Design a protein with these regions (language model features):
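Aromatic-rich, lipid-facing transmembrane alpha helices and their immediate juxtamembrane interface loops
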Residues: 1-165
Length: 165
């Protein structure tokens, strides 16, 4: 949990306070957000453990994002989705836990849809510094979660290596 919090907190602050890709309802990150990332990560980890392992199966889970991403990019609603899709497939292809990243793509989208529907946060329609557009939330917001999960997995692996010496 501490490793998740160590990455989730600064990443949230960077994305919301520096990059400004989304904004919280009262302009400040609620204290429950980093812990919420741990709960979502743990749920994703548990679901991924119950699914058949393998990069090929994980790729199939992410596959439905392709037509939606292309449609949204073509219409101009979410041009950032093309890049996020490539990032997501990169994590599924080369990351240490491909099924986790595939599962997190869907869990993150569900959670982000719920949070935006509640009005807890809103994503910027124009992604700062990039010239890209984003849906509210971006269809592949799960790529940001997968980035955090990759960092957590690699860090945890290193910590365990050091402890086992």
């Amino acid at each position: 949990m501490l490793v998740v919090l160590a990455f989730a907190t600064p990443m949230e602050l960077f994305f919301s306070e520096v990059w400004l890709i989304y904004e919280y309802q009262r302009q400040l990150m609620p204290l429950y957000v980093p812990v919420g990332h741990w709960f979502l990560f743990d749920l994703g980890r548990r679901i991924a453990a119950k699914l058949p392992p393998g990069r090929k199966i994980a790729s199939w889970i992410v596959l439905p994002f392709i037509p939606l991403t292309v449609l949204m990019a073509y219409s101009g609603v979410d041009t950032s989705g093309i890049f996020l899709l490539m990032i997501m497939f990169g994590f599924v292809r080369w990351g240490p836990a491909p099924m986790l990243y595939a599962v997190m793509g869907w869990l993150a989208l569900g959670m982000e849809l719920w949070g935006t529907w509640l009005g807890t946060w809103v994503w910027a329609s124009n992604v700062p510094w990039t010239g890209l557009t984003a849906w509210n939330p971006p269809l592949l917001c799960g790529a940001f979660y997968a980035l955090g999960d990759v960092l957590v997995n690699l860090s945890t692996e290193k910590i365990e290596d050091v402890q086992n010496r």
